[in-house]
A protein has these predicted regions:
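Conserved beta-loop-beta connector loops within the AMP-binding
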Residues: 1-19, 55, 117-120, 156
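Phosphopantetheine-dependent thiolation modules in NRPS/PKS and related acyl-activating systems
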Residues: 154-173
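Hydrophobic alpha-helical segments, especially N-terminal targeting/anchoring helices
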Residues: 3-4, 12, 47, 53, ...
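AMP-binding/adenylate-forming catalytic domain of the ANL superfamily
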Residues: 132-154
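A short acidic/small-residue loop/turn micro-motif
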Residues: 17, 67, 162-165
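AMP-binding/adenylate-forming catalytic core of the ANL superfamily
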Residues: 22, 27-28, 50-135, 146
Length: 173
């Protein structure tokens, strides 16, 4: 099922967190007492995925709950912004994440790897036709090398985000 922040099941078409249960679903993680909140008393498991179910009953997973940026009360899915960036000419890889913002809580930031020089202002302008203004990255960092990866081959979002936050903090001082 798909639930809202209060744990209430949502009607078809509405996005929320995906819960699953069944005989093949685990009931706890081995040696991970910190994960107790992922398992509900009635057998439901919180997947951490943002999803919706359409009117025909098909399930669509659209993002990860941990990869949501909350900017001034607006929820922004990193994958949506990454997809928009990937459509820009010369961008090979994109990684989107939140960075701390005193006023809004978080601000949208991105690190990109491209095969040619990218004009950040032109990139931000072009994103206006694909994304709402509040979803457009305020901070864009250009990497001269392919983006860092973890052992599974996925982009190492945590380390890229940490580096960018450190750079931004350095610029503030």
């Amino acid at each position: 099922g798909v639930v809202d922040d209060g744990g209430n099941f949502l009607p078809s078409g509405e996005r929320g967190e995906l819960l699953i249960r069944g005989t093949s679903v685990i009931h706890k993680y081995w040696e991970r007492p910190d994960s107790i909140d992922d398992f509900l008393e009635d057998g439901w498991f919180r997947t951490g995925d943002i999803a919706y179910i359409d009117k025909e009953g098909f399930l669509y997973v659209v993002d990860r709950l941990k990869q949501i940026i909350i900017r001034g009360g607006e929820n922004i899915g990193c994958s949506e912004v990454e997809s928009a960036l990937a459509g820009y000419p010369s961008i090979i890889e994109a990684c989107v994440y939140g960075v701390p913002d005193e006023r809004l809580g978080e601000e949208v930031a991105a690190t990109i790897y491209a095969d040619n020089q990218v004009d950040v202002a032109a990139l931000q302008e072009s994103l206006k036709s694909k994304l709402a203004n509040f979803k457009i990255p305020k901070y864009v960092r250009i990497s001269e090398t392919p983006l860092a990866r973890i052992a599974s081959g996925k982009i190492d979002k945590k380390s890229i985000q940490k580096e960018h936050v450190l750079e931004l903090d350095t610029k503030k001082t």
